Design a protein with these regions (language model features):
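C-terminal interaction segments
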Residues: 128-141
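Extended accessory regions or peripheral subdomains of proteins
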Residues: 1-103, 140-232
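Short acidic (Asp/Glu) patches
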Residues: 104-126, 150-161
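A short acidic-Thr-Gly-centered motif at the start of a beta-strand
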Residues: 121-130, 226-232
Length: 232
């Protein structure tokens, strides 16, 4: 199945992106597997338009203290950051609205909390091997989250309120099996998006252009010049 054509088709049908307001936000959550199909790159995922997300931003810095450490001389500064805070939002009336804030001392603790706060416990109607059986989180992370994943003090932190991560609640998706070319739908009972979404038709691929051999002239340059002179 042509993955890019499928994404384009969903957009054209109002099932994904800015035209999918009837189902959720314009955010597009795609997990793309490239390269040969294997157990490490078997599926690609196109999530249904999300209806809930959580945004994590760089907190206000504490009072700065001159750091005398020198990691290049085996003198790293060991430290633990404060609370990591996420703002849970819901899509409504054409925009994202803040619902609540949740905090945790580490990234994994925060994700467990978001799992309880954001996700519907209703199971998916269909089950696909290797995939969760109910809604799950998918996200995009900045490298600066190392402040909460490693016990080191970062000397040059991002600016206050810089975006660190976004977590989306995936309560429906179209899965594409690269080995078989088949598609599978993950959805909860009564999801109108899953009832209408249809994989796009295969893109027509033109065959290779046939290279014709160059035409050979029966007249060389000298004969061509003689012919011109004869006309004069």
């Amino acid at each position: 199945m042509d993955l890019i054509r499928t994404v384009e088709g969903l957009r054209e049908q109002g099932q994904l992106g800015p035209t999918a307001g009837a189902f959720g936000a314009p955010d597009e959550v795609l997990l793309l597997s490239t390269g040969p199909a294997s157990h490490l790159a078997k599926y690609s995922m196109i999530a249904r338009p999300p209806r809930r997300r959580a945004v994590v931003r760089q907190p206000q810095p504490e009072t700065s203290v001159l750091d005398q450490s020198n990691p290049l001389q085996a003198e790293p500064a060991w430290d633990t950051e404060g609370e990591l805070t996420a703002t849970v939002q819901a899509w409504s009336d054409g925009s994202w609205h803040d619902l609540q804030q949740v905090s945790a001392p580490t990234l994994d603790d925060l994700m467990r909390t978001l799992n309880d706060v954001m996700l519907d416990q209703q199971p998916f109607v269909t089950h696909v091997e290797g995939w969760p059986q109910r809604p799950f989180l998918s996200g995009a992370f900045a490298y600066d989250l190392v402040q909460w994943t490693q016990p080191i003090r970062v000397q040059h932190v991002p600016d206050f309120d810089a975006l660190l991560a976004v977590f989306w609640s995936v309560d429906g998706a179209l899965l594409i099996d690269h080995a078989s070319g088949q598609s599978h739908r993950l959805h909860v009972n009564g999801d109108a998006w899953a009832e209408h979404v249809e994989p796009a038709e295969a893109r027509v691929t033109l065959g290779p252009v046939v290279q014709h051999a160059a035409l050979e002239s029966s007249m060389d340059d000298a004969k061509h010049a003689e012919a011109i002179e004869s006309v004069k």
